[in-house]
Amino acid sequence: MLTNPSQVIIRNQETLSQHRVLVLNHEADSLPKALLDVAQSVDALALDYHHYLHLAPQANAKLRCYFGHQLPHQDKYDTVIVYFPKAKPLAPYLFNLAAQHLVADGQLLVVGENKGGVKSLVKLLPKYFATGVKLDNARHCLLFGSSLIDTAPEIKLSDWTSQYQLSTPQGNITICNLVGVFSEKHLDQGTELLLSHLPTLSGRVLDFGCGAGVIAAALLKAQPTLSLECIDINAMALASCELTLAANGMTAKVYPSDGLAQTSGKFDGIISNPPFHDGLASTTSIAQRFVADSAKQLQSKGIWQIVTNRHLPYSDTIAAEFGQLTVPAENNKYKLYSFQQA
């Protein structure tokens, strides 16, 4: 089953005949493999770990699958396909990355849903690309084409990172935020509620949905001896978290995980402001699965604490998994749940 943007690419796949193709920011479908019907070879870079896990089992000699914010090599391609990102500020970064991997006069294809911001493509394309041309309009999506006409600047993460000081109940910390990663450049109310009632932890602690590393840095600021693990599904978030920890002289294990699937063993503490945005729609499925899985991975005497939006229906799921739990704090927008394992 192909997503609507992928179906639009298939409608125009004749432009990829015998091309070496790179697909950036692909979705959770088999489009890269399907392109092998016409392309010479296909490489795919996922920025969402779930999308990578969907495609990776299909890899073969002509299809290489990667996860991260950059490729681990400098290979060049005849065509780069970019799926227009849900987080619009990420688009210029993806165009810069595409240019790094295109041959001279190489083809750029950009596809996206009409409601997702792709209509602004022509204005967003950097000057080292030719003016974008609309190639197709179908499945509530648009496909644009362009070509590389000039040398693009080398990608430096520092050019795509905003750095700022954040005041937390644990003290001031430095946050490094790559484009496309959620940040209000001040402590959001949910995280503030969580950090204002942070329990004393010890041993092995998990920060689920770490984002740019705000909770991680605050945890280590207050309790520097923790063995902290930070997980997220988003490559830009993981890179941001690593930069944040480095900027504060802190260390933690930072790695991708689809829910808790890539974690192992039990934790003495699990802390989170769970993500509740999936693409363009608000959803609770990620957090509900996290609640169910984390209940199984909490060590004896371990502490579990999360903050959630009041309007999201977590209460029943949490009660079903943990039974007796406390609400240390709440306000008109957020609610803090806490549980200690017997």
From Swiss-Prot:
The lineage of its organism: Bacteria, Pseudomonadati, Pseudomonadota, Gammaproteobacteria, Alteromonadales. It catalyses: guanosine(1207) in 16S rRNA + S-adenosyl-L-methionine = N(2)-methylguanosine(1207) in 16S rRNA + S-adenosyl-L-homocysteine + H(+). Belongs to the methyltransferase superfamily. RsmC family. Disulfide bonds: none annotated. HAMAP family: 16SrRNA_methyltr_C (MF_01862). It is found in: Cytoplasm. Pfam families: MTS, MTS_N. Monomer. Transmembrane segments: none annotated. Gene3D superfamilies: Vaccinia Virus protein VP39. This is Ribosomal RNA small subunit methyltransferase C. Specifically methylates the guanine in position 1207 of 16S rRNA in the 30S particle. GO terms for molecular function: 16S rRNA (guanine(1207)-N(2))-methyltransferase activity; nucleic acid binding. Keywords: Cytoplasm, Methyltransferase, rRNA processing, S-adenosyl-L-methionine, Transferase. The gene is rsmC. Its EC number is 2.1.1.172. GO terms for cellular component: cytoplasm. InterPro entries: DNA_methylase_N6_adenine_CS, Mtase_sm_N, rRNA_ssu_MeTfrase_C, RsmC/RlmG, SAM-dependent_MTases_sf, Small_mtfrase_dom.
